[in-house]
Amino acid sequence: MSEQRQNPEQEVELNEDLAKMEADVEAAVQAAEEHAEQEQSPEAEIAMLYAELEVAKQTIADQKDGVVRAAADVENMRRRAAQDVEKAHKFALEKFANELLPVIDNLERAIEFSDKENETLKPVLEGISMTVKSFNDAVAKFGVEIVNPQGEQFNPEFHQAMSIQPSNDVSPNTVLAVMQKGYTLNGRLLRPAMVMVSKAADA
């Protein structure tokens, strides 16, 4: 029995089927190759994750450092502002005290050089004395203190020697007399006390 020959239409159809199968195989092979290229080994994936983790850590560290610097800047600004306010307050108080000291000096001189035996002047002197005390009490509330070193050792930080007097009654460098009181403001010198200082008498 002789082989049955295919008609031309069947041959065309068979060729088309073969071509389609070849195309499908090529597509499958290409897809497999692309997938293989995209796939990474577990070691490579772990290495990539570690790299991403390090980047994330560095980002967090940078952000934390920025927050710390910003907080430090804010604290420095707050401290400087507080210092500026304190300096302004002290400067205003110092200026006020320096303006007031000559007034107190004049009132004290009025008492010192007045005729204390004059009965007519006694009420006036008492009033002036009360005024001086009120002034001193008022400024003391703001940290102003009197420097009246009568009988104390001379201290060049708070005293200004106007004259030196020989004396056998006290040790050398003792304040014999206070010509003008000094004042401090919160421990800082406003005005030195003007004094007479002793020295050893000649033998």
From Swiss-Prot:
Disulfide bonds: none annotated. Participates actively in the response to hyperosmotic and heat shock by preventing the aggregation of stress-denatured proteins, in association with DnaK and GrpE. It is the nucleotide exchange factor for DnaK and may function as a thermosensor. Unfolded proteins bind initially to DnaJ; upon interaction with the DnaJ-bound protein, DnaK hydrolyzes its bound ATP, resulting in the formation of a stable complex. GrpE releases ADP from DnaK; ATP binding to DnaK triggers the release of the substrate protein, thus completing the reaction cycle. It comes from the Bacteria. Keywords: Chaperone, Cytoplasm, Stress response. Belongs to the GrpE family. The keyword Cytoplasm applies. It comes from Pseudoalteromonas translucida (strain TAC 125). It is found in: Cytoplasm. The gene is grpE. Homodimer. This is Protein GrpE. CDD domains: GrpE (cd00446). One of its GO terms (biological process) is protein folding.
